[in-house]
Amino acid sequence: MSTNGSIAAEARTARMERSTSESSVLVEINLDGTGVSDISTSVPFYDHMLTALSKHSLIDMTVKATGDIHIDVHHTVEDVAITFGEVLRTALGNKAGIRRFGEATVPLDEALAHAVVDVSGRPYLVHGGEPAGQEYHLIGGHFTGSLTRHVFEAITLHAGICLHMNVIAGRDPHHIVEAQFKAFARALRAAVEPDPRVEGIPSTKGAL
């Protein structure tokens, strides 16, 4: 698969355009925002999840994507997650002065999700707790439950972060996915937040 992309970053903002034979994606973020978003991926439920991610992380986010959704939404969903991971990594820069770690437990009615984020520079995902069959549910007419894990895999790999995501409770497939996105948002918000008491990079190694 051929890819062409360009990234420009200033302060704690970043922008990337990524084009392949399967999709065209633009993502722009501001880590020091207020949760304002402009999302259009042609996958309505995914738009809803990304809007929630922006709102609850306080990361301003613009996402524009088109792709071969007439075949399957998988390519577009994953490529947006890849691009978001890349711009997140870029916007973080050398990670000096951030809190680095974040944790959140978020409910949505009967669903409850717990997320822990480490902006470590080492990509790793631990994802579990979803009820049997969650991956097969079609949510909003296009988004299959299995895509949730794919999104978090792509973000962690390309952002260089560690994420532990565990679904503690849940019955409704929509609620289970949304609780995870909101828990991730709150944990990410805490992890990337500047800590006025931290001087330099929050690692004994001196680099993240």
From Swiss-Prot:
GO molecular function: imidazoleglycerol-phosphate dehydratase activity
GO CC entries: cytoplasm
Broad enzyme group: lyase
InterPro entries noted in UniProt: IGPD_sf (IPR038494), ImidazoleglycerolP_deHydtase (IPR000807), ImidazoleglycerP_deHydtase_CS (IPR020565), Ribosomal_Su5_D2-typ_SF (IPR020568)
GO biological process per UniProt: L-histidine biosynthetic process
Xref: Gene3D superfamilies: Imidazole glycerol phosphate dehydratase, domain 1
Location(s), subcellular: Cytoplasm
Pathway: Amino-acid biosynthesis; L-histidine biosynthesis; L-histidine from 5-phospho-alpha-D-ribose 1-diphosphate: step 6/9
First-listed, main subcellular location of the protein, grouped into a coarse class: cytoplasm
Pfam families: IGPD
Substrates-to-products reaction catalysed: D-erythro-1-(imidazol-4-yl)glycerol 3-phosphate = 3-(imidazol-4-yl)-2-oxopropyl phosphate + H2O
NCBIfam families, sorted: PRK00951.1-6 (NF002110), PRK00951.2-1 (NF002111), PRK00951.2-4 (NF002114)
Family the entry assigns: Belongs to the imidazoleglycerol-phosphate dehydratase family.
Protein name from the UniProt record: Imidazoleglycerol-phosphate dehydratase
